[in-house]
Amino acid sequence: MLCPWRTANLGLLLILTIFLVAEAEGAAQPNNSLMLQTSKENHALASSSLCMDEKQITQNYSKVLAEVNTSWPVKMATNAVLCCPPIALRNLIIITWEIILRGQPSCTKAYKKETNETKETNCTDERITWVSRPDQNSDLQIRTVAITHDGYYRCIMVTPDGNFHRGYHLQVLVTPEVTLFQNRNRTAVCKAVAGKPAAHISWIPEGDCATKQEYWSNGTVTVKSTCHWEVHNVSTVTCHVSHLTGNKSLYIELLPVPGAKKSAKLYIPYIILTIIILTIVGFIWLLKVNGCRKYKLNKTESTPVVEEDEMQPYASYTEKNNPLYDTTNKVKASEALQSEVDTDLHTL
C-alpha cells in the first residue's frame, strides 16, 4: 500500500538522483575541444613615452650626449610619444624630425624658431604629428601605432653650441593569435598566427614535435608546432606560447587510442555515482517500508476496538427485545421454582 505522506519526499529524492546522474555523465564525458585558455601579460614593455620631465631639462649642454640611439618596442594599437634631447626651447635654432619607414621615402618635419615656421617633406601619414605647437613642445606623437610605423625616428636639435641628436629604432609588436586543435593519431597542432616578432612554442609534456615558420610581407610570422605522443598514459597536453606582448597557455585532452586500456581514474566518477545512487535508493526503500509498516500496524490495532464498541449496543438490544430470550428465561425460572418446591417436600 502506498504511503501518501511520503510522496513529496520520495519525489524530491528521485529528482535529486536524476540531477546527480546528469552532472556526473557530463563531467566524465571526454572533451576533444579546447579546454582552457589563459593569458598573462608578463613582459615589461617600454612605456608609451620616453620623454624626460620638464624639471630635467638642462641648460648645461656638456651633460647632454651629442647623439643617442634607443631601441624601443611598442605594442600595436597603442599611442607612442618620441622626445628630443632635454634642451630648453629658448636656446634652439631649428628642430628637425627625420622619419624613415620601411618601403617609404624619408619624411622630414622641421621647425625654425627665428621665423616661427614649420615645414614638412614627404610626410603623408596623418597619425604622425607634433604633440602640440613645436614652439611649445618639440615631441613627436604616433596615434594608434600600426605595423607600417616600424622604422627609425630621429630628432635633430640645432643650438648655438652645436647639434644634438636622439634616435629611436621603433619596433612594432604584434600579438599573435593562438590556436590549438587535435589531429588524428594523438597529434596536436598549436599555431601562433601573424605575430611580430615570431613567437616561441613549447609543450608540456614534451613529445615528438616539429616546428615551422611562415613569414608574411608585412613583417609578421606564423609559427606552427605539430606534436605527437606515443605514450598512451598522456591524456592532457599543454601548448605554451611565449611572446614579447605576453604569454598564453592552452591545453587539450587527447583522444584515447582504440583498444588501449583506460586509466583507472576514468572510472572513479562512475564508482562514486553508483554509491550515491545505491545510498539514495536504499534510504528511499527504508522510508517506504517503515512508513507503511507503521501505517498497517496502527490500522490493525484500531479495528477490534471499533467492532466491539459497535457490537455491544446491538447485542444488548437483541437480548432485550428478542422473544426467544424471554421464553428461555421463563422456562429457566419455572424449573428453578419447581426444584425448590421438591426440595421443601423432601425435607418434610
From Swiss-Prot:
Record's Gene Ontology CC terms? Answer: cell surface; external side of plasma membrane; extracellular region; plasma membrane; receptor complex
Q: Which residues cross the membrane?
A: 266-286
For the Cytoplasmic compartment, the record's topological domain ranges are 287-348
**Keyword Magnesium belongs to the record:** no
| Domain spans labelled Ig-like C2-type | 160-251
Signal peptide positions on this chain: 1-24
Function noted in UniProt: Inhibitory receptor for the CD200/OX2 cell surface glycoprotein. Limits inflammation by inhibiting the expression of pro-inflammatory molecules including TNF-alpha, interferons, and inducible nitric oxide synthase (iNOS) in response to selected stimuli. Also binds to HHV-8 K14 viral CD200 homolog with identical affinity and kinetics as the host CD200.
* Family the UniProt entry places it in: Belongs to the CD200R family.
Subunit annotation: CD200 and CD200R1 interact via their respective N-terminal Ig-like domains. Interacts with Human herpesvirus 8 vOX2 protein. (Microbial infection) Interacts with human herpesvirus 8/HHV-8 protein vOX2/K14.
Name-wise, this protein is Cell surface glycoprotein CD200 receptor 1
